[in-house]
Amino acid sequence: MLSLLIIRATQFAITSFRCESTIYRYCAKYYYIGFHNHKDLIGVKEFCGKHYILKIIHYHMKAYYMYPDIRGDLISFTSDDDVWLLSLKDMKPLRITSGLGVSTRPKISPSGRKVAFSVIWLKSGKQGGDIYVVEDGQARRVTYFGSRNSRVAGWISEDEIIVITDFHTPFIQWTEAYKVNVNNGKTEKLPFGMLSNIVIKDDIIVIARGYQDLPNWKGYKGGTKGELWISSDGGKTFEKFVSLDGNVSWPMIVRERVYFLSDHEGVGNLYSVDLKGKDLRRHTNFTDYYCRNASSDGKRIVFQNAGDIYLYDPEKDSLTKLDINLPTDRKKKQPKFVNVMEYMNEAVVNGNYIALVSRGKVFLMRPWDGPSVQLGKKQGVKYRQIQVLPNGDVIGVNDEDKLVILGKDGSEKVINKDFSRIERVKVSPDGKKVLLSNNKLELWVYEIDNDNARLIDKSEYDLILEFDWHPNAEWFAYAFPEGYYTQSIKLAHIDGKVVRITTPYGYDFSPSFDPDGRYLYFLAARHLDPTNDKVIFNLSFQRVVKPYLVVLGNYYSPFNQPLDEANSNDKNVIIEGIEDRVVPFPIEEENYVQIAGAKNNKIFLFSYPIRGLRSQTGDVFGRLEVYDLENKAKELYADNVSSFSLSSDKSKILLILKDSLRLFDVNVKPDFNSTGRKGGVIDLSRVKVYVEPEKEWRQMLRETWKLMKQNYWNEERLKNWDSILPKYERLLDRISTRFELSDVIQEMQGETRTSHSYETAYDYDTPEPLSVGGLGAEFEYDESNKCYKITKIYVGDSTNENERSPLRDPGVQLNVGDCIKNIDGEDANGNIYSHLINKDQVILDVITADGKNKRVTVKVLKDERFLIYRYWVEKNREYVHEKSKGRLGYIHIPDMMYQGFAEFYRLFMSEFHREGLVVDVRFNRGGFVSGLLLEKLLLKRVGYDYPRNGKPIPMPYFSSPKVLVGITNEHAGSDGDIFSFLFKKYKLGVLIGRRTWGGVVGIRPRYRLVDKTYISQPEFAVNFEDVGFGIENYGVDPDIVVEIKPDDYVNNRDTQLDTAIELALKQL
């Protein structure tokens, strides 16, 4: 269907659409439209009685093609977030899905009448996914796994597909294969355990493990690199089949050979081996872009490369690029309005103006009336670090990391000085000078009038991110990183003189001047007062941050006023003896993160609640208090605050809350129950954020490229980085959706050939995903009774939230063997999980194992992962206890973040007293706490403390037993790599398993693109004295390699755990 883009015609009704040659009917009138070469729309004269200009569009165009599949002469692929089907006979693509979400990885059924595919949903950070089938133009959902990590591997028959998913596994890296009936949705798990792809032809089964598509890490050679296993006896036994020095993916059986993609020779190409894994051949010779996502019908092969689809015929040894022209309206590429609050990340106030940044665009307005005006460039921009100058103009940073002044009159003055990546900006009160810091750890002062820049200071340890101006605009203060974990407060003059105020032995931050120039306020973590940990034998510092002030002149502290002498109004800064004029506030320590001095002796203190970090997700909101320097009292000012800022004269405060922007005078106590001006509410409906995706996507790609150039840890390794941008920019004209942009960005990031190059999108312009409720159990359909029989109930820890099956809740108490007949009054036929979508509670009609009828109300789980994980851990722990007769304990560490820290101590407390420990870091997702855990394991038991009554206590307290055995695998990475290496290095015990992931170039997560997409750059490369940089893109070899073969899963064997138990018992 031809789509017309009408400029300015935003309100109209199309009463009919009819095609007669080139005659189209709109608003009951006929219009003749001219075409050039039968493809390009070239004009229209009149529309509904008015004249409009039509943008020239293409009826057929080159698009971005992904995930091809082939069945005879039919090709399926995805583009424009939909599935398309074309015949090789006429090459006319037909869209067969519309608007479901992001459709990916289609597979054509043997008859060619059905196509199964994945649908991904990502809306405002919420994500999900499942499998659909389209037949006769109708799409229907056939699985309810609720996981984005689900995809179709292929068809078994006309009625059954194989789906790869992480459903009901303890880790997202652990995916298995399910057989799914597309007619009734019933599922059956295949017994081959962890895999990432599977191909079946008669008795030959080829299984792929490891990565199948890794665009963001080209040249990957670590422990998770793809490899192939083969069975020639229908799955009874398997042998490792193909393992090269690079990634191996997408196996396909064509005649008597197995084809696959690999980049072991530098670039992803098509290869094959015979059924014995010999006679390796290369069939393509691409050198620029990778071959990806290959598929075959057993005769010919298709794959994608740089947005094109190629067809390879093994019999003819011929390669053809398919010339596909897509008739698409590119709906998701059309301009749109977005919510200003959802994408607002900066807001400042000064004088009579408020300025804010939303979706990278700058808007200026008066607080209470008048319009909002967009300043600077309108589209394809990202401004940041804005400040309002005294005349109402706005200064900030543009895409090129240049300071810019955006005039109210629409002008834009670029300050053409190279400061590298500008991290923070602060304008002086007189609007004539700018303090700025950069990614080179430098602090600069720039004078606007004379265009002069001066380097003030440079750290060797970290970014300089906090600074403030004295009201006379001659002095300024900043927090200076002095060491790895220490920071001092420095005072500097614009002429370059610098004085350190505080000693470099604590962590001092958030400097802020009193608006009258008498004091400098700051926060410091210096008063270390430990508290007992409530769980483990340890002490910690939970509330250590205290506000301080520096008396800048020769007068009394406000906390020590003389009886009959008024304080001086002298605003001169006296340097001599200033380090002795640092005074703490007479209040208790708290978790303060920001202090700001305001007019009339008001001081604002912002803090975050001390709470568990393990389950903390989304935005964090804090508590804002105000301290009155006159009456020496502190009170709550506002709660649930995202951030705040003061005007330049510090008389007004601007609050960013979860769903509103509010402005108050610092002397007025806010009334959050009122609306409008009384409640300080800024009317943001005046701000219209209009986005042209095509221009925005180009800006996003360029920023991603530039951030990598600025922050990648080794400048020499990116010496050819300038050539990378045009290589991927040329693909932008072909993409139509935000998902396709992600693919291009990730391919570009992969050119670093380094770990931790991530792009995590926030929104793919899809419907919001609906959760699929969980019952914490496994089922099989009972044909005779027409109900779902419970075959397993996952048992976790009933005292922990989300770690107990709701079928075992009080009053419910269902058991294995009970059969669910109805759910909410509907027959529980088809897929049982289809009855649980978007449900909080359900009513189950049950036939118990002894034949009785029972009705129960069940509160479903929103996420079963925690329960499945706890079940897996407890099963392993019980197994270790049983096999060792209680002599060995078991600990699993799922990551090196908050959950991993908690899991370690949760298990260590109950296991450390045993004679030995099995320490399992398989599937460890990394983080930063490996050193804290290793400290505990390094504390070895050397004796016992004997009480009069009770058992002897290991000494030192909570010390580790002498015998430790570690288990690691290819899915242990990042800080999991480091833990595995140091376990060996410190000779804590034997490490067994498989080579680890191999990604140890760390990141500093702090950058988001204009649409809230998170991107990272590898910034810190780990170099160990033994292996140098050798862990990156290789991993850590265990002392003893132990595989878990697919047939081990068939026979329910964990050979790695068995080996660890055996080795530990031998050492005992």
From Swiss-Prot:
EC category name: hydrolase
UniProt binding sites for substrate: G927
Region (C-1): 692-762
EC code: 3.4.21.-
Main location: cytoplasm
This protein's UniProt keywords: Cytoplasm, Hydrolase, Protease, Serine protease
Active-site residue list: H756, S974, E1032
GO terms for biological process, alphabetical: proteolysis
Region (PDZ-like): 771-864
GO cellular component term of the entry, any: cytoplasm
Family: Belongs to the peptidase S41B family.
Function: Degrades oligopeptides in a sequential manner.
Name of this protein: Tricorn protease homolog
